[in-house]
Amino acid sequence: EEIVERHISPLRLSLHCITPEVRRKMIGKHAPHGIEMLERLLDAGIEFDAQIVLTPGYNDGLELQKTLTWAYMHPGILNIGIVPLGYTKHQCSFEKSYNDVDAALDVIDTVEPMQKHALAERGFPWVYLADEFYCNAYPDSLLEHLPPTEHYGNFEMFEDGIGIVRTSVDEWESCAEQLEHLAEVLEEEDARVYYIFGEAQRPCMARLMEEAPTKGRLVPLVVKNNHFGGNVDVTGLLCGFDVAMAIRGISAHDYVVLPKIMFNSNGYTLDDMTVDDIRDTSGVPVTVVSCSVPEYLAEIEELVVGY
């Protein structure tokens, strides 16, 4: 009642599914009542930005189609972001979550018709898929299949992992001159720089680096997340010990840079390691750099030249 009286809108909504039986399985016995409450709020003019956590065997396939169809009939649901279930090795309920090509393609094939319909009718796709679906569906040709920049509008769902890859690609491609210059600097200084990535970046940034003029000098080093396991593969969730083990043996004459997204505001990774801890454990000097492409390219040049 307070939401309606104060017209607190738009709100964030975890929708997940629409069929009562599926909602009971996923959310609990009282879950069906949530749709009744949602419809009351929608009727009162409250708007929502919705999210669906897609879970294999629960709310994908036909259930996803039903959910999207129902939601599209309610204009108050402004948009929907779909993200895959995340899981670690420290549980036994899930062993996969659209990690393979076929499963990820099935999701894309389910969602694309609704995106095209919404684009034609409303002028924007309305439902957006997390980057993981495209990365998993096109491991060897992601750059050829990634949605264009305009697909993501103002990137409202960036924090949900929707459009991050496209942003990184656009930034990289806008830095062509900067990359040419950095390639010259690295060659002149006879320097090699290893940039740490999570496995999720292999189809995108790792490939871009391998095709850039800095190839062989600015080297992507993809690190597996052994600490969490499962399908946890983004750079921001990398743990210090995994990185330390991955960089052991790198020459002291080379450089290793870590994106600052690995660290919290106090300078710790998720396994409570600092930059100094990573250096001491690996025996290799490491430097933290920005996540923005033009910024970290400039910081790498400063690191190598020494000013």
Give short role names for the model-derived ranges:
Residues E1-P75, G86-M114:
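Conserved Radical SAM active-site core
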Residues Y72, N79-G81, G86-Y307:
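Auxiliary Fe-S-binding modules of radical SAM enzymes
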